[in-house]
From Swiss-Prot:
The keyword DNA-binding appears for this protein: no
Residue numbers binding ATP: 229-231, 238, 490, 542-545
Residues the record marks as site: Important for tRNA non-discrimination: 40, 91
Organism classification: Bacteria, Bacillati, Bacillota, Clostridia, Moorellales
Keywords for this protein: Aminoacyl-tRNA synthetase, ATP-binding, Cytoplasm, Ligase, Nucleotide-binding, Protein biosynthesis
Localization per record: Cytoplasm
Catalytic activity line of the entry: tRNA(Asx) + L-aspartate + ATP = L-aspartyl-tRNA(Asx) + AMP + diphosphate
Domain of life of the native organism: Bacteria
Protein's UniProt name: Aspartate--tRNA(Asp/Asn) ligase
Gene field: aspS
Region: Aspartate, residue numbers: 207-210
Amino acid sequence: MVVVEGLAGLHRSHGCGELTAADAGKEVTLMGWVHRRRDHGGLIFIDLRDRSGLVQVVCDPKSGPAFQKAEEVRNEYVVAVRGLVRRRPEGTVNPKLPTGEIEVVAEEFRLLNRAKTPPFYIDDGIDVDEALRLRYRYLDLRRPEMQRLLYLRYRTTRAIRDFLDARGFWEIETPMLTRSTPEGARDFLVPSRLRPGEFFALPQSPQLFKQILMVAGVERYFQIVRCFRDEDLRADRQPEFTQLDMEMSFVQREDILKLVEELMAYVFRETLGVELALPLPRLTYREAMDRYGSDKPDIRFGMEIVDVSDLVAGCGFKVFAEAVARGGVVRGLCAPGCAGYSRRELDELTRQAAVFGAKGLAWMAVTPEGIRSPIAKFFTSGELEGLVARLAGKPGDLLLFVADTETTAATALGALRLEMGRRLHLYDPEQLAFTWVTEFPLLEYSAEEKRYVAVHHPFTMPMEEDWPLLDSDPLRVRALAYDLVLNGVELGGGSIRIHRRDIQEKMFNLLGFTPEAARDKFGFLLDAFEYGTPPHGGIAFGLDRMLMLMARRDTIRDCIPFPKTQSGTCLMTAAPSGVSPEQLQELHLRSTARKSTNPA
C-alpha cells in the first residue's frame, strides 16, 4: 500500500485548468483530486481536478515509483504531480476540455491523502438526490458547476464593492445581536445569560441601524450582511440569507433608482458579460396589478389582463352583471391557440384560479364559426364581438374571465397568466427582463389583526401629495417605495424613509401602537430624529435570490454554500440540535417540548 506523504518541498506552480498548448515543454507541479483514473495498455491516465478545471496526467511504467503510486489511487484521492507538459498525440485531442490539447507526463507522484468511495460521483452530469447532496455538501461543492456558482457569488460581491467604493459608499457592520421589534416575520431569539428572562434578536435587516447611520452623518452606507427570519420556507427563501443593504442621505427617489440601475448594469456586465439597456422600465403598483395581476410582474411576455366591466355591466349573464353592480370587476385574458382545451384542462385552470380566491372561471373559445362557450347564450352578438375585440382574440384563442373583487380578479388572473406563459412557452428563459414597481400603497388593512399594517415597513415615507389622506383615508396613501423585479421575482425593495418625528409618530399611531408602545420599541429612533435627521432613503437586495436568477437556477439553495433544507435543518451538521440541561440552566431556561428526532 502506498504511504500517504507530505509536500516535502513541492510547490504548486499552476492550476490544473490553467495549462494550454503554450505551456508545452514546461515542467509543472500540480495538486488536486483524482477525478477519474483509467488504465490503458500499460499507461495510466488520471484526470486531475482542482477548482480551475481538469487536466490529463499520464503515468508511464518507465517513471518507476510515480507509476506504482498511480496504480493505487482511486477517485477523490488527493495527489501532487510534478511533470512535463506535452501536446497530446494526434487523434487524442479532446475539444470538449479547455486543456484538451495537452497532457502532463508524470515524473514525480505523491499521495497526499486517501478518500473513501464517495456516495455519488463528483460530476455535473449525475442526477443526485438533493438531500444526499446537502448531507455531503463538502463533496457536492467540489462539482464544477457548484464551483462556478461559488465563484459567481464572489465575483458579484466584489463587483458590488468596487462599484459602491468608487461612488463614496462606506461599508459598515451593524450589530448581529439587537432587540426584537414587531411588524416583521418571527425573530430568532438569543437568550441573555447575564440578564435572565431577556432576549436578543438576530436582525431581520439592518433597517434601523442604517437609518441611525444617516443621522450620524455617514451619508452613504452599504453592507453585505447576514439577515435572519423565522418563517415558513419556500424554494427562494432561507432562515438565514445574505442581503446587499444600502442607504443614502440627501437623496430623492430618482437618485436611488438611477444609482441602482447603474449598479445592476455594472454587476451584470462584470460577472455575466451582459449589457443592460438603461433606464429600466417602470410600472406603478396600480399598473402592475391591473395589467399583470402581480406586484412582481414578469414582463418577458404579453398576455396582459384586460378590464371588461363596462362591456358586461348590462349583459344577460348574471354572474358578470351582478359582480359589477356590487362594485366588483370582470377581467379577462387571451390565451393564444388554446381554443381546443379539453374539459379536463379547463377544470384544472378553474381549480388554479380558485386557489387565489376566485369563485369561478368563465371561458370562451374563439373559433372561425364564432364563440363556443356554455355562457355565450347570455350575450348578444354585439357584446361577444366587443369582448373578443377588447381582448384581441383571434380564431383558435381561448378567453378566460374572472368576476370578483378587484384584488381577487387581479391575483387569480395573474396566476393563470404565469401558468399559461409557462405552458405555452411564451418567453425566452434566457431573457433578463427588469422592471421597477413604484407607488405602492403605504398601508393595507388586516382583517385578522383588525388594524392597518405597513405594506413595506413602518419607516416608509408617504408621498408628499398624499399626506393629507393620512387623517382622512389612509388606505389611499401611496408610499415613496419601490421594488426592482427581474423575470417576475422581487430582487429588492426600498423606499425614501421618514425622517421627521411627527410623521413617524403618526405612522406608529396608524399602525395601532400606543405612544408608550412606540416609545418602548422605537424610542432610540424617535430620539435620534430630534437631532437633525437628513432626508434619506435606500434599498436592500436579496443576494442569494439575485444569484439564483443570474445563474438560472430553480432554488437559492444551489447559490448558498451551506443552505438549510425547506424544513429549516442543516443535513450536514444536523442543526438545530438539543443542548445539555447545564446549558439551559445557565440561561435560566427550561425545555417544555417533547423530545423529537431531528429529520436531519
